[in-house]
Structure formats: structure tokens, C-alpha cells
Amino acid sequence: MKSVLITGVSRGIGLSIAKEFIQNDYFVFGTSRSKFDLSKALESNNCKHLIVDVNDRDSIASIMKDIPGENNTLDCLVNNAGITADQLFIRMKDSEWDDVINTNLTGIFNITKPVSKMMLKQKSGSIINISSVSGLMGNAGQVNYSSSKSALLGFTKSLAKELAPRGINVNCICPGFIESDMTNELTSDQRDQALSQIPLG
């Protein structure tokens, strides 16, 4: 059975991705920052929940021994964990900038590094980074979020060139406006702005 590690698995896009992998007969390792009944959410025992904060390198190191699947390999990493802290730039607190950049960009560095070492040893694997259309187009009130997601595109392109010769794929997906717990936190103006970018509304 193939295995996948998905960060930010407790809700929204991450949980939907996990369900898709379960349907395709993968064993799912899913992370979140707090306790979560992943088996119940996925209606499957082919999964394991790991409590980890992608900002905490010691926390990541402590779970790596639990990651390899039944063949002592990890076939795929999905970097999905992310946060928003929307605010007009002139009013944005340092902490709102730091928290978003640390989770959405540095957090991906933190977990991808040990996973890529594992994949280099096995000479195979796939890394999928979840960016956002906000990283392509920008959004008012999301300078921090858009910056983190735009930077992730560069991260992906560069890492892909480094790892491709060793048989490891690195790709990035930029979802548009998707109904989720994160988008439910947007103001009506932000929702209207996002919807205005969709030709069919």
C-alpha cells in the first residue's frame, strides 16, 4: 500500500485531499496542531494522525520516525497546512506578517527538508505544494498571504529542478475560491473580490 503525508488535514482542502487518497488505496499520515479523530473523519483505519506544528522543527523531527509506510517508504507529501491573517497592509501587525509567512512558507521548508531526504534515499516520490490563486493575482488585504503563496511557486520550481534528476516530482497547485473554513472567515468585501475574478461567478 502506498503512503502519503498530508499537513493541515483536520478540515477544508486538507481533509478533502485525504479522503481522495483513501479512496485510491493510500495509507494517509495526516497532521494538525491539535488532537483530531482522523479515522472517524475518513471512515477508514488506513490512516494515522500526528500532532505537529509545522513551525516547530523539533516537533517535526519527533514524528519522522512514525512516517514511513509498510514498505518503509513515503510515496507522497502534500504541503497543505496554511493560515490567513487578513488586514490592510498599513494596519498589518508584525505578528500577522510573521505568523503567515512562518506557517505558509517556512513551515513548508521545515517539513519538506526531512521528507525530501527520505525520498532521495528511496530515489522516488512526489511533493505537492498547495499554493493559491492569490499567489498569482494578489488580493487587497492579503499582502502577507499572497506573498507566502507567491513565494511557494518559486520554492516549487527551484526544488523541482534539484530533485527531478533523482526521480522525485515537485509540483504546485493554485486553487481558486473554494468554500472552506478558511474562506468562511473572509469579509463580504473579500468574498466579493474573489468571486469577481471567476468568469462564471
Feature locations, PLM:
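Active-site loop immediately N-terminal to the catalytic Tyr-X3-Lys motif
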Residues: 90, 137-143, 165-166, 201
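Alpha-helical segment proximal to the catalytic Tyr-Lys
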Residues: 117, 161-165
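Residue(s) in the substrate-gating loop at a strand-loop-helix junction
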Residues: 132
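Substrate-binding pocket helix/loop in short-chain dehydrogenase/reductase
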Residues: 88-89, 93-101, 183, 191-194
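Active-site loop-to-helix junction immediately N-terminal to the catalytic Tyr of the SDR YXXXK motif
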Residues: 92, 138-146, 158, 186
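Active-site helix of classical SDR
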Residues: 112, 148, 156
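Conserved glycine-rich cofactor-binding loop
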Residues: 10-11
